[in-house]
């Protein structure tokens, strides 16, 4: 069995408790208090009990604390996947979207995401999903534009004949025209 990983020398239990009081991150405070118990000479099993974790996790906290100090005990955000397009490829994509497709060359009259997926593969040999292309376009400042939907059998010449020409006529109701009936209990009742 290996020996325990030692904590760094530039902190002590009191300093870690002070940092735990000042932090606004509850997880960091719990980890600092667990490490303070180790600094005070307590066994690592007590630190695991204080942190409500296993000994392996306490060891991971010690390694993170030794490497980056108290900031190493804050949960970091996962970096996520690497972008498929580099800056030059993004600029080429923006340029081709702004200039629009050439029907004789690209075979389309307007860019759709699936057409851009095909263009990116032909130009850069990078396979992308349509949603990823949409995310890239949004990051470049482009927005999806769509025409107002129309019925396929709509006759544009007869649209004016069906438009409402007069404004609605509003009249005031007579006073007391809708007097609600009440029951013996005071609530409204239905008409028979």
From Swiss-Prot:
Chain intervals for the UniProt region annotation (Disordered): 168-192
Disulfide bonds: none
Start-end of Polar residues biased regions: 182-192
Record bears the keyword Protein transport: no
Record Pfam families: HTH_29, HTH_33
UniProt keyword terms in alphabetical order: Plasmid, Transposable element
Family in the record: To A.xylinum IS1268 ORFA.
Protein name: Uncharacterized protein y4pG/y4sC
Organism field: Sinorhizobium fredii (strain NBRC 101917 / NGR234)
């Amino acid at each position: 069995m290996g020996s325990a990983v030692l904590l760094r020398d530039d902190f002590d239990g009191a300093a870690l408790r002070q940092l735990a009081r000042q932090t606004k991150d509850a997880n960091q405070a719990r980890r600092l208090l667990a490490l303070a118990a180790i600094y005070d000479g307590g066994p690592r099993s007590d630190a695991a009990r204080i942190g409500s974790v296993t000994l392996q996790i306490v060891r991971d906290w010690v390694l993170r604390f030794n490497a980056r100090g108290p900031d190493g005990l804050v949960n970091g955000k996962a970096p996520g996947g690497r972008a498929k397009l580099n800056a030059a490829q993004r600029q080429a994509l923006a340029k081709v979207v702004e200039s629009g497709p050439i029907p004789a060359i690209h075979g389309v009259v307007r860019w759709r995401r699936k057409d851009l997926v095909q263009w990116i593969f032909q130009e850069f040999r990078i396979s992308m999903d349509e949603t990823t292309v949409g995310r890239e376009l949004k990051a470049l400042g482009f927005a999806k534009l769509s025409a107002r939907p129309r019925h396929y059998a709509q006759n544009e010449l007869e649209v004016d004949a069906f438009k409402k020409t007069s404004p609605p006529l509003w009249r005031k109701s007579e006073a007391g025209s809708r007097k609600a009936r009440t029951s013996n209990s005071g609530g409204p009742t239905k008409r028979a």
